[in-house]
Regions:
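Transmembrane helix-boundary motif of multi-pass solute transporters/channels
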Residues: 9-47, 57-61, 65-71, 211, ...
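TM-loop-TM module centered on a large, flexible mid-protein loop between adjacent transmembrane helices
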Residues: 69-73, 244-294, 310, 314
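Select transmembrane alpha-helical segments in multipass membrane proteins
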Residues: 6-16, 41, 78-91, 122-129, ...
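Membrane helical hairpin/interfacial module
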Residues: 36-37, 41-125, 129, 133
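Transmembrane alpha-helical segments of multi-pass small-molecule transport proteins
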Residues: 11, 48, 52, 83-86, ...
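Helix-loop-helix connectors at the membrane interface of multi-pass transporters/channels
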Residues: 32, 102-122, 216, 297-324
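Hydrophobic, membrane-embedded alpha-helices of multi-pass small-molecule transporters
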Residues: 11-21, 167-174, 183-251, 286-296
Length: 334
């Protein structure tokens, strides 16, 4: 078989979208829109090149090379080993995975916790324990990831974000705010740099192997067929990212006209949610942050475990999942 069915292509594409769409992707566009104001759409062109275009190219490059190690081997075998290990460690257990567990708590749960209910440390521990337990369970069966993420987690996330945008149409925030900072003189370049800061270009080097393995599990064989289907999934996922990023940037731009400048994108989103949904907006925001970070966390743990198991057959895939989930939970609480 050379082509994924429409259903499988949609599921793989949704899974790829959810792998990329983490907490940073949720807060960058609103903050960009608020800061860029009337120059939002010029800024977004630059942002989309590095936050969508580059990552999709990365997925295709890794798929075509049958893994990051093979891609880097074109330089030198030793370089490939060192480079690949550093990439997986830095974007995985060294930063990305622990941050995926702690960031939604700090951004969307802690600010709305009743004072004196429980200590910050205990609340964070409880949250991250539940978070990484769910992530661990999801990662145990890589073959089921596409169904669990593509059928449940990602559609839920998309529905919730779309609901915010639709609600903002019926309860508009206002007009676009004024252009501020670097966006005044160089909106395109500023957006270009902001898009790179999502770190998805680097993450794509990790996720490429996950997508290739998922496509193979659907009965696709041969390098050309895998690359072809990776491109299709990338285009579909990229289109979804563009739509969602544009929605979030619009919300941020209109919030600037009503609330003025905020310190970060999380605060911008919090203002929008409270204005549109009232107190219930805090709960909705916490759910969105958690889902966005959970899907990215699952992708990182899976990709890192898949690679590390190739370095030593003495440690199984499930053991690596256990090690990464536990160590990341500990780091998230430090």
């Amino acid at each position: 078989m050379n082509n994924l069915s429409r259903k499988d292509l949609a599921l793989v594409s949704l899974m790829l979208f959810s792998l990329f769409f983490g907490a940073g992707n949720l807060i960058f566009p609103p903050f960009l829109g608020q800061s860029a104001g009337t120059s939002t759409w010029v800024t977004m062109i630059g942002f989309l090149i590095t936050s969508v275009g580059f990552p999709i190219l990365g997925v295709v490059a890794v798929a075509k090379s049958s893994g990051l190690h093979n891609l880097a081997s074109r330089v030198h075998p030793l370089f490939a080993t060192v480079f690949t290990i550093l990439i997986y460690l830095s974007i995985g257990p060294g930063l990305g995975i622990p941050r995926a567990g702690s960031l939604p708590f700090e951004m969307a749960v802690r600010p709305f916790m009743p004072e004196g209910l429980v200590s910050h440390g205990l609340a964070l521990f409880i949250y991250t324990f539940i978070f990484f337990s769910v992530a661990y369970w999801l990662c145990l069966s890589p073959s089921k990831l596409v169904d669990r993420m593509g059928k449940i987690l990602t559609p839920t996330l998309l529905i919730l974000i779309s609901a915010i945008f639709i609600a903002s149409i019926f309860k508009p925030l206002g007009s676009y705010g004024e252009v501020t900072g670097n966006y005044i003189h160089s909106p395109f370049v500023s957006g270009f740099l902001d898009g790179y800061m999502t770190m998805d270009t680097i993450a794509a080097l990790n996720f490429g192997i996950v997508i290739s393995l998922v496509i193979k599990s659907k009965g696709i064989e041969g390098e050309k067929a895998i690359v072809k289907n990776s491109v299709k999934a990338g285009i579909f996922a990229g289109g979804l990212l563009i739509i969602i990023y544009s929605m979030l940037a619009h919300l941020g731009a209109t919030s600037g006209g009503r609330f003025g400048a905020t310190e970060n994108g999380a605060q911008t989103l919090a203002n929008v949610m409270l204005y549109i949904f009232g107190d219930g907006g805090a709960v909705l925001l916490a759910v969105i942050f958690t889902l966005a970070c959970l899907t990215t966390c699952v992708g990182l743990i899976t990709s890192c475990s898949q690679y590390f198991v190739t370095l030593s057959s003495k440690v199984s895939y499930k053991a690596w999942v256990r090690i990464l989930a536990l160590s990341s939970m500990i780091l998230a609480n430090m």
